[in-house]
Every structure is written in structure tokens, then in C-alpha cells.
Amino acid sequence: MPVSKEYVEYVLDQLSCLGPIAHKRMFGGVGLYFDGLFFGLIDDDIVYFKVDDITRRRYEAARTKPFQPGGEGPSQSSYYSLPVNVLEDLDQLKAWASEAVEVARRKASSKNARSAKRK
């Protein structure tokens, strides 16, 4: 689904509370990067943050939806939509975004460790 330029600018402005955020258009959406880590995305003017088995519970408790690029159906997504009220509250947003960055950092570290073992 399309992502509006205005919405991307709004999200980037809100996320500036975390620090410099890079973004890149991809597959009709926008990828969000902090310190080179892919921690979130925007699709159809909805923000999704990276989750793991621990942080997913917080999103499920907030009744947010998993990112499902292929439509509805059973999915164990690594990305969940951000509650709208969190996007509007900079203190909460910084906490949720920082958590998503840490999830991305842990996943990147575990991938690097697996790659090193194979060599």
C-alpha cells in the first residue's frame, strides 16, 4: 500500500526524539533505521516496530496488529503496529522505539555470532 510523504515526514519528526533516523523506500513502504539497524517500517501510513518473543506481548496487550504484507492469515510477524497514542507521546515513543532498536541489535548480534561459528 502507498505511504504518503507527509506521513513519513511526521513519523521521522516524531522519531527524532531517539536521534538521527534514516529511511529508505522499499517494496512500496519505508524502512526505518537507527545506527544502521532496521528497527521499523511504515506501510499504508501505519508504523510497525520490530519485536521479539518478549516484546511481542506488549504489542498484543495493546491489541495492535502484526505486519502481514500478504494479507490476513496466521503469521508470526517480527513487526507489529505501533499504538497511535504512542506515536503522539514523545516519551512513550522514545521508550517503544528504543526497545525496537534493542530487539534489532540483539537479532543482528545473534546473526553475527551464527555467521562466525560457520567460518
Regions found by a protein language model. Give the residues of each.
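Charge-dense, helix-prone N-terminal extensions
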Residues: 1-119
